[in-house]
Amino acid sequence: MIKFNMVFSKQAKSNYKYWFLCLMNKRELFLLGSIFILTACSSPKVSTTVSLQEPVLQLLDVYEIPFQTMFQQTKVGGLSSIDYNLEEDVYYLISDDRSAFNPARYYKASIRIRHNKIEDITFISADTLRRYDGSMFPSFANDPFQCPDPESLRFLSTTNQFIWANEGERLINHEKPILLDPAIYISNQNGQVSDSFKIPSIFKMNPGEKGPRRNGTFESLSLNKHLNMLYACMEEPLFEDGERAGLHDSTAWVRMIKFDIETKDPVIQYAYKIDPVVHKPNPENAFRVNGVSEILYAGNKRMIVVERSWSAGQKPSNVKIYLADHAVASDVSSIKSLTVGGFIPVTKKLLIDMDKLGIHIDNIEGVTFGPRLLNGNPSMLFVSDNNFNKGQVSQLLFFELKNFSE
């Protein structure tokens, strides 16, 4: 946020009447000007400093949840989102366990913060995600056509409900193609689905190169300040919108969608350009990806965007945090392919490249605003998904957001 703070002396603020100046001859004007200059020079020093303050993310603390932590007979891991309930001072974290280790679920937890440090995290409950009929979601082994892929969860305090994203599935080389459309569900306090948002047909799975890519759909969700709009963002481009992020290109577009909470209808779509993949994979032709792993509404039509890049044979991931602005972005709902151009995209500005923190950064997939710090600045917490992998960690990163106006 740019702030201007300009202070002038009283002489600089004087407003001479136009008619008075008109009565003066050139000599009088010259003498008056000389007096003005001398008076200004003899007055106290004038500050004309322009303060240009950009938002800054400063790391305060890092906390790791031990590998294979067990709670209520569930394996804690795969934490793919985090959301803060200010009234109860608790957090909700969804697991992307596809009912493989334990039934699909989310956790309620208390995170104790003192002196800008995370003292500990205490899990309060593990709540199972359930289908419309109240039954649990099956594992891939039991029913690959109904197995969920939970990725993001937000708490809707106005109705005490949860909104969560299911990435769906697209396996066309299976003995029988498995196509499960991505979905955004609304669940009650017991985790049971009661409703869902209306997903435009362009986001439906297809056996051909059309629609979403596998594991590239709704990875991120966020509610606006007034809790009447929901934002969702694709992790990767639709087939129609062009190639995935490459090593050196910057032509990959993903779609950000705004939904009406009351009607569940899509309202508008925006185009957001993701960065190239950061590191070359090893070997060079191995898998690589960069995409949006989470978003967080930040007020005034701005969004915190988490971009995560990963390459086979390299360190776990590179994570960059952007402040995106869609105030003047075009509605691309009617554009069938973003490769044609002719639209105004969401703008973005880098807040932090976590590579430069000098610490191990794992697979960051969740972000939320936390409690206000004592100095009044917002705090932010990020969480990483360890993929239930011993070589990865479930991290909580605690940040202060400076120079930020909501």
Regions found by a protein language model. Name each.
Residues 1, 18-53:
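Bacterial Sec-dependent N-terminal signal peptides
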Residues 2-19:
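Arg/Lys-rich, positively charged N-terminal/basic patches that mediate binding to nucleic acids
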Residues 6-9, 31, 260:
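Alpha-helical interaction segments
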Residues 8, 35-38, 148:
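Generic signature of intrinsically disordered, low-complexity, basic-rich segments
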Residues 13, 21-23, 35, 89, ...:
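Short linear sequence elements within intrinsically disordered, low-complexity coil regions
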Residues 42-406:
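Sequence/structural signature of beta-propeller domains
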